[in-house]
From Swiss-Prot:
This is Serine--tRNA ligase. The lineage of its organism: Bacteria, Pseudomonadati, Pseudomonadota, Gammaproteobacteria, Vibrionales. Its EC number is 6.1.1.11. Pathway: Aminoacyl-tRNA biosynthesis; selenocysteinyl-tRNA(Sec) biosynthesis; L-seryl-tRNA(Sec) from L-serine and tRNA(Sec): step 1/1. GO terms for molecular function: ATP binding; serine-tRNA ligase activity. InterPro entries: aa-tRNA-synt_IIb, aa-tRNA-synth_II, aa-tRNA-synth_II/BPL/LPL, Ser-tRNA-ligase_type_1, Ser-tRNA-synth_1_N, SerRS_1_N_sf, SerRS_core, tRNA-bd_arm. The gene is serS. ATP binds at residues 273-275, 360-363. It comes from Vibrio parahaemolyticus serotype O3:K6 (strain RIMD 2210633). Homodimer. The tRNA molecule binds across the dimer.
């Protein structure tokens, strides 16, 4: 969430910055609530001051033998106490309304982020690799997978429903190999610590990284049992939409020593998304699934280091594509296309031959102190007493299913076989082709 001080002391400036991303801040309502807060706060402080002043008179009355006077003052204090409690409740109610406003407000975009409305206004930064030309009719990854017997969408529909997949044989092994290669690269060369985390999280975790309260409809939620099981209280949990949630929340409610920053973590997990609002989009194939695997990259940094860390983290995701020899382009998202909690985001888009276009395969974001404030994730500088908020960053390094799509389609050969990228062959038992 944003620093509430911005809404109190820089309201108009903050509203103008948020307008860049198409968000209309209800300035008048916030201003009225802030005026109420100030007024009630003054009343609370005056009542506290009066009560404290009168309380001192009790001792004086008792010392003078004026018990009746002392009792009268006690009655006054009781009345003041009741009035004070009532005003505190009023103050809490106004503060709750202000907090509710704050929770619905997205992050402020960085100054250098291009203005725009949607993905059409994103700005291309660079390209790597040249799309291949083929002298035979291209097949998409669905046809390639079904022809090889490795992608079974029909069985997935029978077992669960649409937007799920069953993989078999060499296709399942390729999927595993991609994730293993990514983890090895990030841990052995890029300095990340591999994490194994829960796939179910509580609402506090989802609040911390910004999925709640705004994006609950995008999640899969469990229904708590009506009674205890193994002495555990019933609780509602949610399947993770990304490993960003459990991994970033590892620093929730902690104070890290400056010397221990940056913290760099990676995790391979399944991700679960309802894909609310995507009806009719990418209904064929592996591009948009309810369940998909992803290798996530997370960095926790000092404030002054986070923009440099964003470039580094994005470069780590790019390295995966380069080693797999997959053509891609890098774009910076415009203000209108960025995620709710992001201050700046790069997308990496891989070439998908059958669609003759680039498709997103990684999104790398600097969340600034937006998540840290929600999580109370802080660090303490050497020699300082007061802790500061960390900055958090995350990115896909990469989405495994979409990487598989790119490999299948870019590496297909005229006879229907798929050439396995050189860096993956050791994970595939030395095989050079599928099929």
């Amino acid at each position: 969430m944003l620093d509430s001080k911005l809404l109190r002391t820089e309201l108009d400036e903050t509203a103008a910055k948020l307008a860049r991303r198409g968000f209309k801040l209800d300035v008048e309502t916030i201003r009225k609530l802030e005026e109420q807060r100030k007024s009630i706060q003054v009343e609370v402080e005056n009542l506290q001051s009066t009560r404290n002043s009168i309380s001192k008179q009790i001792g004086q009355k008792m010392a003078a033998g004026d018990k009746e006077g002392a009792e009268e003052i006690k009655k006054q204090i009781g009345t003041l106490g009741s009035d004070l409690d009532a005003k505190k409740v009023e103050l809490e109610q106004v503060m709750a309304q202000l907090d509710e406003f704050t929770l619905s407000v997205p992050n402020i975009p960085a100054d250098e982020v291009p203005d725009g409305k949607d993905e059409n206004d994103n700005v291309e930064i660079s390209r790597w690799g040249e799309p291949k030309t083929y002298d035979f009719d291209l097949k998409d990854h669905v046809d390639l997978g079904e022809m090889g017997g490795g992608l079974d969408f029909a069985s997935a529909v029978k077992i669960t429903g649409a937007r799920f997949i069953v993989m078999k044989g060499q296709f399942a092994r390729l999927h595993r190999a991609i994730a293993q290669f990514m983890l090895d690269l990030h841990t052995e060369e890029h300095g990340y610590t591999e994490m194994y985390v829960p796939y179910l999280v509580n609402s506090d975790s989802l609040f911390g990284t910004g999925q709640l309260p705004k994006f609950g409809k995008d999640l899969f939620h469990t229904e708590p049992l009506a009674e205890k099981v193994n002495d555990e209280e019933p609780r509602k949990l949610s399947l993770i939409p990304t490993a960003e949630v459990p991994v970033t929340n590892l620093v929730r409610d902690t104070i890290t020593d400056e010397a221990d920053l940056p913290i760099k973590m990676t995790a391979h997990t399944p991700c679960f998304r309802s894909e609310a609002g995507s009806y009719g989009r990418d209904t064929r194939g592996l591009i948009r699934m309810h369940q998909f695997d992803k290798v996530e990259l997370v960095q926790i940094t000092k404030p002054e280091d986070s923009m440099t860390a964003l470039e580094e983290l994005t470069g780590h995701a790019e390295k995966v594509l380069q080693l797999l020899e997959l053509p891609y382009r890098k774009v910076v998202l415009c203000t209108g296309d960025m995620g709710f909690g992001a201050r700046k985001t790069y997308d990496l888009e891989v070439w998908v031959p059958a669609q003759e276009t680039y498709r997103e395969i990684s999104s790398c974001s600097n969340m600034w102190d937006f998540q840290a404030r929600r999580m109370q994730a802080r660090f303490r500088r050497k020699g300082e007493k007061k802790p500061e908020l960390v900055h958090t960053l995350n990115g896909s390094g990469l989405a495994v299913g979409r990487t598989m799509v790119a490999i299948l389609e870019n590496n297909q050969e005229a006879d229907g076989r798929i050439a396995i990228p050189a860096v993956l062959q050791k994970y595939m038992g030395g095989a050079t082709h599928i099929g």
